[in-house]
Amino acid sequence: MSVLEENRPFAQQLSNVYFTILSLFCFKLFVKISLAILSHFYIVKGNRKEAARIAAEFYGVTQGQGSWADRSPLHEAASQGRLLALRTLLSQGYNVNAVTLDHVTPLHEACLGDHVACARTLLEAGANVNAITIDGVTPLFNACSQGSPSCAELLLEYGAKAQLESCLPSPTHEAASKGHHECLDILISWGIDVDQEIPHLGTPLYVACMSQQFHCIWKLLYAGADVQKGKYWDTPLHAAAQQSSTEIVNLLLEFGADINAKNTELLRPIDVATSSSMVERILLQHEATPSSLYQLCRLCIRSYIGKPRLHLIPQLQLPTLLKNFLQYR
């Protein structure tokens, strides 16, 4: 009992220390929020000089210098789509390529928020269209992740690289995995390699099959993606069978997927399909039924035309019915 009484003062002192730390934290947070609101008020009201002074004191930078703070006024304006505030800050001389500790630029923020007008303003002011974060993410990757075809098109027009090294995050794979087929369509129109394989992800077609994104799978196959290329020895058909996606399995088979392809474990697509499932029945039926002559002819002609020239099929001097047939329409 006496031991508890001796320890009580120390416990009270310790609790007082924690209470003091918490109070200081809350006070600093209140000050920061107040300054941010005040800075925004001055920007909106057009008092550029006062806004610049508050921003410089708050973020510890001067006009024209890069920001290594966690967030700069440009980042906030771009992420929230506040075009007027963004233009005001740029007119004050703030660095359009200001970065955070993770190398995130205002352009990254604008694209992630699908703020096309802000992205255009930043690009016109000289923003680095191929800026890379510490994680290897580009503004184009953010646009495709968000599903913003307008931002993606804008970035490509300003010189964004549609595909980078295989070790960096891929806009194509991101669009395919999230089902953003409009972004994928734009990337394809800019000449990406639809069969780009990233070691830990596989090809865009494989990623789309794993995510069961039918429209993206159709876009990739229509653009000439190799129906056999997946992740290592796993084919897209393995992925579709594993996900029990009958619609995707039928589509892959229509484009010539090999049902006898084996992965690293020597398993065929039918072996990874759920037992007694519809996918298993489809694969068994396809295995027992030879491909029709017209399907084999279509695959042969498309292969002869070649992936880079498939988009020219509508220009061939052929009957419309035959052109539609070659385009799976």
Swiss-Prot record:
Q: Where is the SOCS box domain?
A: 278-329
Against Pfam families, the record matches this protein to:
Ank_2, SOCS_box
The UniProt entry's GO biological process terms, in alphabetical order, are: intracellular signal transduction; positive regulation of protein catabolic process; protein ubiquitination
Query: What InterPro entries does the record point to?
Result: Ankyrin-SOCS_box_domain (IPR051573), Ankyrin_rpt (IPR002110), Ankyrin_rpt-contain_sf (IPR036770), ASB5_SOCS (IPR037328), SOCS_box (IPR001496), SOCS_box-like_dom_sf (IPR036036)
Indicate yes or no for the key word Repeat: yes
ANK repeats span 69-98, 102-131, 135-164, 167-196, 200-229, 232-261
Q: Could you confirm whether the keyword Repeat appears in this record? A: yes
| One Gene Ontology cellular component annotation held by this UniProt entry | cytosol
The entry's keywords:
ANK repeat, Repeat, Ubl conjugation pathway
Q: In which pathway does it act?
A: Protein modification; protein ubiquitination
Q: What does this protein do?
A: May be a substrate-recognition component of a SCF-like ECS (Elongin-Cullin-SOCS-box protein) E3 ubiquitin-protein ligase complex which mediates the ubiquitination and subsequent proteasomal degradation of target proteins. May play a role in the initiation of arteriogenesis.
Give the protein family. Answer: Belongs to the ankyrin SOCS box (ASB) family.
Q: What is known of its domains?
A: The SOCS box domain mediates the interaction with the Elongin BC complex, an adapter module in different E3 ubiquitin-protein ligase complexes.
**What protein am I looking at?**
Ankyrin repeat and SOCS box protein 5
Source organism per entry reads Homo sapiens (Human)
